[in-house]
Design a protein with these regions (language model features):
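Positively charged n-region of N-terminal signal peptides that target proteins for export
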Residues: 1-7
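Bacterial N-terminal signal peptides
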Residues: 7-16
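N-terminal, motif-rich segments that launch catalysis or mediate targeting to/interaction with membranes
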Residues: 20-174, 178-181, 185-208
Length: 208
C-alpha cells in the first residue's frame, strides 16, 4: 500500500509540473519548415542547379534578398516566410485566415468580446487560385510565388532576378505555414486562439 501511495504521489507531482511549450509558437513553424526543406528535393536533386543556383540551400555564401531586403540563405528565406505568415502584431489580420474546417470547408467564424471575427479558409487564402482579389493584394500566396518565380527567371537585370527568387522562396515558406496549421487541432476546430484584436492572451499563452 505504501508503494502504491508513493507511486500515485509521483504521478500527481509529475503531471502537475508546468513547462514551456512551443506548440503554437513561431519557432515551431520554423523548426518544422527547416526539417521539410532538409528532406525536400532541394537537397537531393538538381532542382536548384536547373534554376541557375548550383549550391546548397544552407550555403552562407549564396544568399538572396527577403521582403525586407535582408540577404538570406535559401533555407533562411523559407524560415522567414514561416515566421512572417503569423503577422506583425495584433492588428495584422493574416492569422485569421489560417483556419479550415474539413467537414464544411469553412474558415474561421465567431466572435471575440462581441466583435465578429472571420477569415477565408486557409487553402483558399494560401493558394489564391481563381480569386477575385488583385494579384499580390494579400501577399505571399502560392500564386504570388509563381509570379516571383517568373520574374526571377526572366528579368534581364541580375538584381531583379535575385529579388524575384528570394521572394519566391520566402513566399513558399508562408504557404508551408498554412499546411502546418491545417495539421493542428485548433485550426481545424474553429478554436480562436488569436490575439485579435489585442483583447488578451491567446490559448497558447495560457497553455505555455
Amino acid at each position: 500500500m505504501k508503494a502504491a501511495g508513493l507511486h500515485l504521489s509521483l504521478v500527481v507531482a509529475v503531471t502537475s509540473l508546468t513547462i514551456e511549450c512551443a506548440a503554437y509558437e513561431i519557432e515551431t513553424h520554423q523548426d518544422l519548415t527547416s526539417y521539410a526543406v532538409g528532406y525536400s528535393l532541394l537537397q537531393t536533386s538538381r532542382k536548384l542547379a536547373d534554376l541557375g543556383m548550383p549550391w546548397s540551400p544552407v550555403d552562407p555564401d549564396r544568399t538572396l534578398p527577403n521582403s525586407s531586403g535582408d540577404r538570406r540563405t535559401i533555407v533562411e528565406l523559407f524560415l522567414d516566410g514561416a515566421a512572417f505568415e503569423d503577422g506583425f502584431g495584433c492588428t495584422d489580420d493574416r492569422p485569421r485566415n489560417h483556419f479550415f474546417n474539413p467537414l464544411n470547408g469553412q474558415g474561421l467564424t465567431g466572435t471575440i468580446l462581441g466583435f465578429n471575427v472571420s477569415g477565408e479558409p486557409s487553402p483558399k487564402w494560401a493558394v489564391e487560385q481563381n480569386s477575385p482579389a488583385t494579384p499580390g493584394s494579400r501577399g505571399f500566396s502560392f500564386r504570388d510565388a509563381r509570379d516571383h518565380f517568373y520574374r526571377g527567371t526572366t528579368r534581364p537585370a541580375r538584381g531583379d532576378r535575385e529579388t524575384g527568387l528570394g521572394l519566391m522562396f520566402q513566399t513558399l515558406g508562408h504557404v508551408v505555414h498554412h499546411l502546418q496549421d491545417m495539421a493542428q487541432p485548433q485550426h481545424v476546430r474553429n478554436d480562436m486562439h488569436l490575439d485579435l484584436p489585442c483583447v488578451g492572451p491567446p490559448l497558447s499563452d495560457i497553455l505555455n
